[in-house]
């Protein structure tokens, strides 16, 4: 089982990820794009990062809006360093 990150560590790490928040034991962020196509290009890029890192986000998409949630299933659905690694990778796509 993966080791979850403490609330203090989460707050420290979130300071380096503008727009990301923590609630309900998940990291979360919403993105707005110009149109649906741009949102889908972003989601496709996320899919490659998720596969590369072997860590997969929760994704919600409606037209030009994308919502990402991150939690680690094999850490009892808590936040781990894997979630922050994927969040940083997602941010690097913009």
Model-based region annotation:
Residues 1-34:
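N-terminal first-folded block
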Residues 19-22, 45-57:
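Short arginine-rich
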Residues 44-45, 88:
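Solvent-exposed alpha-helix faces
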Residues 24, 61-65:
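Short Gly/Ser/Thr- and Asp/Glu-enriched loop/turn motifs at secondary-structure junctions
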Residues 67-93:
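C-terminal structural segments of small proteins and small subunits
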Residues 54-60, 89-94:
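A short N-terminal helical cap/helix-turn-helix that marks the beginning
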């Amino acid at each position: 089982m993966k080791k979850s990150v403490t609330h203090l560590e989460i707050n420290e790490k979130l300071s380096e990820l503008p727009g990301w928040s923590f609630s309900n034991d998940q990291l979360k962020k919403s993105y707005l794009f110009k149109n649906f196509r741009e949102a889908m290009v972003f989601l496709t890029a996320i899919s490659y990062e998720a596969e590369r890192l072997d860590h997969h986000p929760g994704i919600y998409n409606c037209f030009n809006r994308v919502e990402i949630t991150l939690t680690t299933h094999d850490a009892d659905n808590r936040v781990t360093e894997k979630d922050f690694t994927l969040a940083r990778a997602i941010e690097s796509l913009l």
